[in-house]
Amino acid sequence: MNKQSYTAMDYIENALDVIQGRKSIHPSFSLCNVAEKQVAYVRDILTGKNKDKSKLHALNLGAMAAKEFETTDEELARHLSNVNYIASQMAQGLKVILPHEQDNEYLKRQKRYRN
């Protein structure tokens, strides 16, 4: 799929796919279970299945990406960071700027992952 046509849901579904792949290898790894629940919650908010946005402020996907997966599973860290980026904008009631769109904060974060 062309990055320019990506939607917030594409980022979330991709993250869930990666998490489920990791869970198939390590089914009892609790961090993957926590990440999956949090990403699924963001998906449910985005689709309207869940209307309670109060938990968006309590998500720790970004911290999980940086502290737990950045050095051991860069792909999963990138996906969690993308979902965290989307969720943090949703929590603030902002129009969501997707990670691939030109945004200085996103570009800084991507440089950090490449180095």
Across the structure, where does each feature detected by a protein language model lie?
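Serine/threonine-rich low-complexity intrinsically disordered regions
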Residues: 2, 7, 30, 52, ...
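Generic structural signal for well-ordered, non-transmembrane alpha-helical segments
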Residues: 6, 10-13, 33, 37-40, ...
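Amphipathic alpha-helical interaction modules
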Residues: 18-70
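Amphipathic alpha-helical binding modules
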Residues: 59-115
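Short terminal alpha-helical segments
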Residues: 1-36, 107-114
